[in-house]
Amino acid sequence: MMKTLSLQSRAKTTALKQPKEIFAFARDIDGEFVYDQKIVKDENVSYYYLPDSKIDGSIDLQAGYAKFKKIPEEKNMSDMKCLLTALTKYEQEHNNGEKVNVDIITYRGLMTKLLALPYNLNDPVDLNVLAYDGQLFINSDEEIELARRKEEDEHKQQSMTPEKYDHMKRCEFSGYKFEAIATLPKPWADCSRQQIDKRGKKMVNNYEQYISVIKTGIGEAKMLLAGEVDCVWDYIPEDGKDVLSHYMELKTTRILESNGQVVNFEKKLFKTWAQCFLMGIRKVVYGFRDDSFFLRDVELYKTEEIPLLIKNNALTENKSGGKINCTTALKWYGAVIEWLLQEIPRDDTSKAYRVSFDPSTRTFTLRELMGNENSRLRNGEMLTSEFKQWRESIQK
C-alpha cells in the first residue's frame, strides 16, 4: 500500500494548541541521560548572559576549535529510547500512573521538517511511524538518516577545496561556541566572577543537551513533542508554570552585506521560526559573525514577529518558487498531521509505516513496512521492552 498527499493540501485551521511543558530531561557531557527533574533543572539548564559591552569585535567564535568535543553522528540522533524512558518516569511519578493523553509522540525537529517542507523542497524526509497503545510514535529512520549524513559529508569533501570544507566545519563549530560564550551554568547572581569571565576558555562540546517535553497539537490532534532548548532568558519560575516563555533559542550566521545574503537569511529565519513556534519559545538571539569568525553583532527576534518580517521583506516580493508564508506552512503541517491520523489505524500493531518526501519527484507518500522492518522497529529500535511492559501493566 502506498498513499500520496498532494503538496497543495491545506488544513482548514492553523489553530495550534498552546504548548505546555510537562517535563524535561537532559544529556550530560559524557553522553549519559539525566531524568531526575530537580537535577535536570538545577544542573543542566544554561542562562543567557551577553551584555552589549562584550560585543566589541574581540569574541573569536573559532577559538578552541581544535579541542571541540564532538559527539559521534550515530549517538546524535532523535533517540526514541531515551524519550520513552523519560515518558515512562513522568507517567509513573507525575501523571497518576496514567498514560499521557495525546495522539502523537515525536520530536520537535522532525515536525519542523514537515512544517517547513513547502519552502524546503530540496530536503528529503524519511520518518517511521508505529501505532501502539492507541498512539502514533514517529521517528527518523536511523539507518537512512545516518547514511544520508555520511553521503552528504563525503560529497562536500569531494566537491569542496580542503580550505572551503574546513571553513564549513568552523561555521558549524561557531554555533556551539556562541552558545558557550553567551550562557552561564546558573543565573548571573549565582555565578562566580571566574565562571562569568572564563567562558571563552571553556571546552566546547555538542554532547550536553537540555530537552523540554511539551503537550501541544494542531487542529483536533493532540501531540507530545520533545525538543532541545538552548537556554533560559531570565529565570525558571518556581511554580514551573509557563516555563516555555522563559526559554530562548540561540543561532549564528554571517553578517549580512548584500541582498542575496538577506534572502538566504530569511530562509534560516523561517526555519528558526518553525522550530520555536512549535515549542512555544518566544525569543531568538542571532549572533552575527564575520568571515574571520569574530562576533560583530547580536540581534534579538521575537518569534511571533518573524512571520511579519518575512511578509514585509521587499527583496523577496517576486521570488521564484513563491514568497515564504508562515500561515501556508502551518496549514500544510495541519493537513499532514490530519492525514496521518486518518490513514494509520491506531489499534493495528501488525504494520509499521514510512512517511517520505522525495525531492526528485516532489511526492509526499505513506507506505506500509511489513515483516522484519515492523518487528525491528517494535522490538528495540523505536519501542523498548521497558516501555511496552509499563504500558501493558496499566492496561490490565
Swiss-Prot record:
Binding-site positions, a divalent metal cation: 179, 230, 249-250
Keyword RNA-binding assigned: yes
Catalytic activity: a 5'-end NAD(+)-phospho-ribonucleoside in mRNA + H2O = a 5'-end phospho-ribonucleoside in mRNA + NAD(+) + H(+); a 5'-end (N(7)-methyl 5'-triphosphoguanosine)-ribonucleoside-ribonucleotide in mRNA + H2O = a (N(7)-methyl 5'-triphosphoguanosine)-nucleoside + a 5'-end phospho-ribonucleoside in mRNA + H(+); a 5'-end triphospho-ribonucleoside in mRNA + H2O = a 5'-end phospho-ribonucleoside in mRNA + diphosphate + H(+)
Cofactor: a divalent metal cation
Name of the top EC class for this enzyme: hydrolase
Keyword Metal-binding attached: yes
UniProt-annotated location(s): Nucleus
Listed EC numbers: 3.6.1.-
CC terms in the record's Gene Ontology section: Las1 complex; RNA polymerase II termination complex
InterPro entries the UniProt entry points to: RAI1 (IPR013961), RAI1-like_fam (IPR039039)
Residues where substrate binds: 107-109, 228, 251, 275
GO molecular-function terms, A-Z: enzyme regulator activity; metal ion binding; mRNA 5'-diphosphatase activity; nucleotide binding; phosphodiesterase decapping endonuclease activity; RNA binding
GO annotation (BP), single: deadenylation-independent decapping of nuclear-transcribed mRNA
Cofactor comment text: Divalent metal cation.
Record text on subunit structure and interactions: Interacts with RAT1; the interaction is direct, stabilizes RAT1 protein structure and stimulates its exoribonuclease activity. The interaction also stimulates RAI1 pyrophosphohydrolase activity, probably by recruiting it to mRNA substrates.
PANTHER family (UniProt xref): DECAPPING AND EXORIBONUCLEASE PROTEIN, DOM-3 RELATED
Function: Decapping enzyme for NAD-capped RNAs: specifically hydrolyzes the nicotinamide adenine dinucleotide (NAD) cap from a subset of RNAs by removing the entire NAD moiety from the 5'-end of an NAD-capped RNA. The NAD-cap is present at the 5'-end of some RNAs and snoRNAs. In contrast to the canonical 5'-end N7 methylguanosine (m7G) cap, the NAD cap promotes mRNA decay. Also acts as a non-canonical decapping enzyme that removes the entire cap structure of m7G capped or incompletely capped RNAs.
Protein family according to the UniProt entry: Belongs to the DXO/Dom3Z family.
Protein name in the entry: Decapping nuclease RAI1
Organism: Scheffersomyces stipitis (strain ATCC 58785 / CBS 6054 / NBRC 10063 / NRRL Y-11545)
Record gene name: RAI1
